[in-house]
Amino acid sequence: MHVTAITMEDANFPYRLGTDCAEELVARLGVRAASRYLVVCDTTVAALYGHDLVARLEKDAGPAVLLTHQVGEVHKDVTTVGALAEQALGAGADRRSVVVALGGGITGNIAGLLAALLFRGITLVHVPTTVVAMLDSVLSLKQAVNASFGKNLVGTFYQPAEVLADTAMLRTLPEREVRSGMGEVVKNALAVRPAMADRLAGLLRPDARYDDDALRWIIAESVAAKADVTGADKHERGDGLVLEYGHTAGHAIEHAARGAVAHGAGVAVGMVIAAEVSHRLGHASASFVARHRELISKAGLEDTVPACVRTDDVKNWLTYDNKRGYLDCAADTTPMVLLAGPGRPLRTGGMPLVPVPLAVLNETVDALAAPGRAGTDHRTAVPV
């Protein structure tokens, strides 16, 4: 496995990336000499990889137990974390146990918060199984779950000891989830690492079919992009906030969709909304907005608010964005990451956030509603 040293201020951990490397992955976990391996995954990943990983660990590393949670964003909450904690303690977890987060971003957050809370903190190792997790969520110290008022509002910061990524696990990933991951890749190219954009444009596939070489390049570039901004900002409260590009409207769309819209798909639309807002406010050019649409289309993602979502709901959730409080904003504004051009975030007092009038943001959301539907009519949720 290729090793990249991740440094976020005083937080350091290795990111190991390979293909068809299950034996090496288990060997790396075995080095931890855990009293018990607590493998956390959802019920789908349990059937694909969870039972096999537990069996391999039992054979070659030490005692292991599988802790499962239900699939979906609606289960990413404190209730799930509490239930898993009870299961872990009932299975004999102690301070020398290791939490293995086997899955995508939802599982990573659930398991990360679990590791931070058990005995006030035990070892956490990420084994990501989705594109979003491999190139984005496992590279953050943020471990959070949702509340009824919005996404990622309850959590803490907690460092993983290691990331072990095997691209072979992406072969079972539904096309919807692969496209979702590419939404975050496009974000990296637009907001953080514009030098990767041209090659990325040639690699992106609307059919979501990528070979291992392409995936390794995409993941490695995205890891480097995230490291560029978190190296001196481990809590992502300064320059690291640029990684929130597209997430203000993206999170609102996800929440309004009640799980029917994948994270990266929401972020993709959120980026177009942010670009259009920046253009309306006189900062971004029309050609830069078009570049957003080009890359998003090449990734097989939509660039309008999905028809399954009521725009009135999106506008409501925008007022609960988790970046509120970073800036002293008027009641009729909300803080957003906006770009003036590739890799050029607008700033307020050195921070890559600007107050955006809610009237302009809401008008843009309405303008980007999927054709043929009003903002308040009701639709059946269809996954995107």
Swiss-Prot record:
Keywords: Antibiotic biosynthesis, Cobalt, Lyase, Metal-binding, NAD. The active site is at residues 142, 244. It is an enzyme of class 4 (lyase). Co(2+) binds at residues 184, 247, 263. Its EC number is 4.2.3.124. Pathway: Metabolic intermediate biosynthesis; 2-deoxystreptamine biosynthesis; 2-deoxystreptamine from D-glucose 6-phosphate: step 1/4; Antibiotic biosynthesis; lividomycin biosynthesis. It catalyses: D-glucose 6-phosphate = 2-deoxy-L-scyllo-inosose + phosphate. Belongs to the sugar phosphate cyclases superfamily. DOI synthase family. Catalyzes the intramolecular carbocycle formation from D-glucose-6-phosphate to 2-deoxy-scyllo-inosose (DOI). This is 2-deoxy-scyllo-inosose synthase. It comes from Streptomyces lividus.
